[in-house]
């Protein structure tokens, strides 16, 4: 959702994670931050500033050997190369879903965190199916409109046809 609950008390910058706020706070604590002359963005290291400044000049010295696409930052090349290898190094400890990019993974984890912090159930009350986002649950609920559910008395799972319910109940 792009929620950024952690804010800097010095400048008001907002962050998704407390660790990013702590890293940002070094800019204020060290007293001598490095500032981009193009946009005024502050950095704590010379290498981070140099990598950032490439984005203004259009310089892209890192190229992919598979497709020759070029990148301003080495890390962006490394992430891109995963599209060729199929590597998905970021794994959700809650549901097991795997991700190629850290940004995708972080966004996904926010869904689980939001569910825990809000105490909100993202389970369909009609059939019990679980969802990681409120919008997916809302769309799913529409699939039940106009249906009279046949519900298992043991587990609450619903079925469209009596034969499906009977078959399911044999499992219990």
UniProtKB/Swiss-Prot annotation:
- Residue ranges of the C2H2-type zinc fingers? 6-28, 34-56, 62-84, 90-112, 122-144, 150-172
Q: Does the keyword Transcription regulation apply?
A: yes
Q: Quote the cellular component terms of the Gene Ontology held in the record.
A: nucleus
One Pfam annotation, family name? zf-C2H2
Keyword Nucleus found: yes
The family database entries (Gene3D superfamilies) matched by this protein are listed as:
Classic Zinc Finger (3.30.160.60)
Q: Give GO terms: molecular function aspect only.
A: DNA-binding transcription factor activity, RNA polymerase II-specific; RNA polymerase II transcription regulatory region sequence-specific DNA binding; zinc ion binding
Give the highest taxon in the source lineage: Eukaryota
Spell out the subcellular localization from the entry.
Nucleus
Keywords assigned by UniProt?
DNA-binding, Metal-binding, Nucleus, Repeat, Transcription, Transcription regulation, Zinc, Zinc-finger
Which InterPro entries does the protein's record reference? Znf_C2H2_sf, Znf_C2H2_type
Q: Which family does it belong to?
A: Belongs to the krueppel C2H2-type zinc-finger protein family.
Question: What is known about what this protein does?
Answer: May be involved in transcriptional regulation.
Mind telling me which PANTHER family this protein's record contains?
ZINC FINGER PROTEIN 142 (PTHR24409), ZINC FINGER PROTEIN 322A (PTHR24409:SF331)
Instruction: Kindly provide the name given to this protein in its UniProt entry.
Output: Gastrula zinc finger protein XlCGF51.1A
- Organism encoding this protein: Xenopus laevis
Lineage of producing organism: Eukaryota, Metazoa, Chordata, Craniata, Vertebrata
């Amino acid at each position: 959702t792009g929620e950024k609950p952690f804010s800097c008390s010095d400048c008001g910058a907002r962050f998704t994670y407390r660790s990013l706020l702590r890293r940002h706070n070094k800019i204020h604590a060290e007293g001598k931050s490095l500032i981009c002359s193009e946009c005024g963005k502050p950095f704590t290291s010379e290498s981070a500033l140099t990598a950032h400044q490439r984005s203004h000049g259009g310089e892209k010295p890192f190229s992919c050997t598979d497709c020759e696409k070029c990148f301003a930052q080495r890390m962006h090349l490394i992430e891109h190369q995963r599209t060729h290898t199929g590597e998905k190094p970021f794994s959700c400890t809650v549901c097991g879903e795997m991700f190629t990019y850290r940004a995708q993974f972080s966004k996904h984890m926010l869904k689980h965190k939001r569910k825990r912090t809000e105490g909100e159930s993202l389970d369909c009350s009609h059939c019990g199916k679980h969802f990681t986002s409120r919008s997916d649950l809302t769309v799913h609920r529409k699939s039940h409109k106009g249906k009279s559910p046949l519900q298992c008395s043991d587990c609450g799972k619903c079925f469209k046809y009596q034969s499906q319910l009977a078959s399911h109940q044999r499992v219990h």
